Amino acid sequence: MWGFFGGAKKQDPKDTIISLRQQIIVLNKKNDNLIVQIQEQENLARKHVTTNKLMAKNALKKKKNLEKQQETVQGSIDSLQTSINTLETANLNLETMKAMQEGAKAMKQIHGNMNIDKVDKIMDETRDQVALSEEVSEAISRPYANAYDDEELEDELEALEQETLEGELTNAGHVKQDGVQVTPHDLPAAPNQVPAEEEDDEEEELRRLQREMAL
């Protein structure tokens, strides 16, 4: 159809391919019909080749004409098929190009506000934040520093040990007589002179108690 300005209306490649295929269908029917007619003329020539040579000769002439027509039709079919193949390839290339154009357009839109400097800056900031996060995690997991003076603790422990030993020795001074507990001042006064052997035993007992309390 001609437009208002005398130009032909552009036809979609797909519509053109459909039209060509329809034309091939028509030509194939004509080609099949010609093949049938060719075979009929050949059969007629064979039938009269011995009885009526003139009729047989005319049949062969018709056969030759039909064969030329069939060759022309077949050539047209082949040409149309080639055109269809070319159009299909071109249309496929066109659709591929359109898809690539859309993809490039989308990528351009995505990268519109992006450049290598911004990417490098973002990566640097990300690395800094990761390093900061690791430092914070390390600081949180680090145990508290020793808030006590070890020497002061040792002195306090020694004083406590001495106090405990003295208490134990005081309790050890109580003895039982006839089932009744008495204190040292209830016992008869001991002689001023203590045998050396008894002093050694007491010293040994005292050291033993100290060792037990130190455990």
Curated annotation (Swiss-Prot):
Family annotation (InterPro entries): Snf7_fam
Keywords annotated in UniProt: Coiled coil, Cytoplasm, Endosome, Membrane
Gene Ontology CC terms: cytoplasmic side of plasma membrane; cytosol; ESCRT III complex; multivesicular body
Subcellular location, record wording: Cytoplasm; Endosome membrane
Region (Disordered): 182-215
GO molecular function: identical protein binding
Membrane topology annotation: Peripheral membrane protein
Residue ranges that the Swiss-Prot or TrEMBL entry lists as coiled coil: 14-85, 149-173
Listed GO biological process terms: ATP export; intralumenal vesicle formation; late endosome to vacuole transport via multivesicular body sorting pathway; peroxisome organization; protein transport to vacuole involved in ubiquitin-dependent protein catabolic process via the multivesicular body sorting pathway; reticulophagy; vesicle budding from membrane
Stretches with biased composition (Basic and acidic residues): 205-215
Statement: the UniProt record of this protein carries the keyword Nucleus: no
Domain of life: Eukaryota
UniProt function note: Required for the sorting and concentration of proteins resulting in the entry of these proteins into the invaginating vesicles of the multivesicular body (MVB). Also required for the proteolytic cleavage of the transcription factor RIM101 in response to alkaline ambient pH.
Oligomeric and partner information: A component of the endosomal sorting required for transport complex III (ESCRT-III).
Record-stated family: Belongs to the SNF7 family.
Protein name per the record: Vacuolar-sorting protein SNF7
